[in-house]
Amino acid sequence: MKGIFLTALALTAACQADKSPSALLPVGTVLAGATTTNPTERVAELYVSTEVVGFIEPCGCTSKPLGGVQRLATVLKRGRPAHALLDAGNLLFPAEPLTDTTREQHVLKARILARVYRQLGAVAINLGPSDLTLGAAFLKELQREGAVPWVSSNIRPLGEDGPAIAQSFLRDVGGIHVGVLGVATPESFAGVKGVAAIEYATAVRAEQALLRRRGAEIVVVLARVGEKGADDLARDVPEIDVIVRAPGTPIGTPPAPPKKVGSVIVLEAGSQGQHTGRLTLRFGAQVTRPIALDDAGADQAARRALADRKIRAFRTELDAWQADPTKADAVAKKRAQIAELEKQLAAPAPAPGPQPLGSVRVELVPLTEDVPPDPIVADVLAAYYAELKNLNLSKGDVRLCAKTAAAPTYVGTEACKSCHPQAYALWKTTKHGKAWATLESQNKHFD
């Protein structure tokens, strides 16, 4: 079965290798990327992920699961021919320590993520602390299996046993020279062996200057420094253009809309690979700074969502106040506030206009069930689950699960049916009634 798994990975490589206009090359090399036919207009897309932490697809615990590398592959293939993929750090492993029970499973997933990201056109993967969960030697092994473009300007390898970690990359994406560098907080690498960490703002300032001298027209920083750290970095080093900050907003809360901090665009893409950020670069023959942010209506949507939350909160207050005659004036004012907010929401939200020349449009793309899985990457995941089944079966003696006369037995739902026929009939109509069959049909009952 391991052969099937490796064959599936090889198939992905054979079908997708070298199709990206941003294939991996040594530091200092600028690619001849796909260019537009109009020399006065250059358009390219950058896709970004933040805090994937080893998730190759959603766990399936929610009614509308988000995420999955097979969906990410589809989104990228539907995008512009000139595109590249970036990650802001902590791609491979969870932030919490691995257990002996799940270690091998996480290693399998890390190998999938490294290979799939590479074949989807990843041109820079910022080094996060959890990426070094198995040590620097493991990352070097991944690079031997297939080039993995690690980047960090302030986390540097020690000795020769670790992976190659570039301080920055210069890429040609759709005729646009994109400089990419990565940083992380030194304290997040405290106790991590094989690397040395230095202060990141100084490293960014020096590296962006080098990228400019080499011809970078736009400089993107993959910064695993938190929200405040990203805002401070934008103020401290205004010479950069874009910060992709991590960690992203935890799942269950919508990712923050993009914003401008001074002249710098700051954005994130959530967590666990549930979304991808899409940056559409649209420039003329020259790039004029500061680069404008086109948020594709995200700020307007956030304002409308805030207004809706306020209405619900105000109505809750009204319910508590209306029985109190001493609060009549407050009730009237609150009703007026609700009416004004409802008036704002009644007006249709303006549709985003054409993207202006000289701007970066930032959109958050949710990887929903509506996005069909890419068949090649789906085959890789199917091989992974088959390998995982064999792996977990090999860990124990299945004979210990055999029935014995003295041991309690599992009777199943049929034993409930005779006493509770109506409840049983209702249960059979729910998703709970076919939960195990669902797991089996997707080969996930050993996950």
Task: Give a label for each model feature.
Residues 2-13:
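Bacterial N-terminal signal peptides
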Residues 5-6, 115, 415-418:
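Alpha-helical interaction segments
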Residues 6-8, 35, 41, 410:
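Residue-level detector of transmembrane insertion/anchoring sites
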Residues 13, 57-59, 399, 414:
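Secreted/extracellular small peptides and ectodomain modules produced from precursors
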Residues 15-390, 419:
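Acidic, metal/ion-coordinating pockets
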Residues 375-447:
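Sequence context of c-type cytochrome heme-c attachment sites
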